[in-house]
Amino acid sequence: MLDKIWYRSKPNLLSRVLQPISLVFIDIANKRKIKQQLKQYKSKIPIIVVGNISVGGTGKTPVVRMLAQQYLAQDKKPAIISRGYGAKADNYPFEVTSGTLATQCGDEPAMLFDALQAQVPIVIAPERVQAVKYIEKNFPDTDIIMSDDGLQHYKLARDKEIVVVDAIRMFGNKLCLPAGPLREPIERLKEVDQIIVIGNCSDKDKELLKNYKNVTYAKVVATEFVNILTAKKVAKTEFNHQNAIAIAGIGNPTKFFKTLEESAINITAKKVFKDHHKFTQSDFEGIDSDITVVMTYKDAIKCKNFAKANWWYLDIALDINV
């Protein structure tokens, strides 16, 4: 319901009614920001925060993955910190290892660890400062730390801020919670170092973005399909015009389905779950065992223990237009 209210070009009646609450939200958020900045922790290791000013999935994690791969290619030693949304670790800070389950560390850290083939230390903690201090102590030769989300976590000083924007949703009605989808007023974009817009913007939105510096456009590119059970990789054309069921438990499933359609797969059914859904075998009851199942990388990480031979995830990369 809120999506229908938030993602209109102009505020509707309900958004107007909620605006006074939004003003209270902004006031509380500003006071919290000032309070956190007074006790801000500054690491000797450079820190890049990759975040957003709106709720929901915008593509932060693929950007973090891309940056980590770039640093590795330059023979640098990056590390990643995350809140670990939905994580249930016994203690924090918690380092992700090869035996860590997504339920312990959260979906995104588990996916990043797998995608980066354990080459990058990944540490989670609700208080990101704890994660940074853990890296300083245990990985002192780290060249750079990337924070997956955490733009509004002002207890941690940062050397660079990158905001990721979904080109389809953009900033909705441009109002703050609960009247709109923004965590901070849109003016916050004037303070960040870089804005990465993922997807195809309308001409109107491109005009809006001209008000901000260092705007980079990117698009999600399907690279290959990976078998969840065997890790076998096949070309993205492997399933052209074949029937498949698409599964998505992410913040913005529409983007995933669109990418699949662009890959010429014949999607016969779509099953959508809430973001960070904890998958079990029962979620797949009623699905014909002979039909191909395709899902996101993030969802696949949670289905490895009960995956079937014809279950695949679509891996992606970002094509950056600098």
Curated annotation (Swiss-Prot):
Catalyses:
a lipid A disaccharide + ATP = a lipid IVA + ADP + H(+)
List ligand-binding residues for ATP. Answer: S54, V55, G56, G57, T58, G59, K60, T61
Question: What are the record keywords, sorted?
Answer: ATP-binding, Kinase, Lipid A biosynthesis, Lipid biosynthesis, Lipid metabolism, Nucleotide-binding, Transferase
Pathway(s) it belongs to: Glycolipid biosynthesis; lipid IV(A) biosynthesis; lipid IV(A) from (3R)-3-hydroxytetradecanoyl-[acyl-carrier-protein] and UDP-N-acetyl-alpha-D-glucosamine: step 6/6
Q: Which InterPro entries match?
A: LpxK (IPR003758), P-loop_NTPase (IPR027417)
Q: Show the GO MF annotations.
A: ATP binding; tetraacyldisaccharide 4'-kinase activity
What is one term from the GO cellular component aspect held by the record? plasma membrane
Give the EC number(s) listed in the UniProt record.
2.7.1.130
Q: Which GO terms describe its biological process?
A: lipid A biosynthetic process; lipopolysaccharide core region biosynthetic process
Taxonomically, which superkingdom?
Bacteria
Q: What does the UniProt function comment say about this protein? A: Transfers the gamma-phosphate of ATP to the 4'-position of a tetraacyldisaccharide 1-phosphate intermediate (termed DS-1-P) to form tetraacyldisaccharide 1,4'-bis-phosphate (lipid IVA).
The record's similarity note reads: Belongs to the LpxK family.
Q: What is this protein called?
A: Tetraacyldisaccharide 4'-kinase
Q: Which organism is it from?
A: Francisella tularensis subsp. tularensis (strain SCHU S4 / Schu 4)
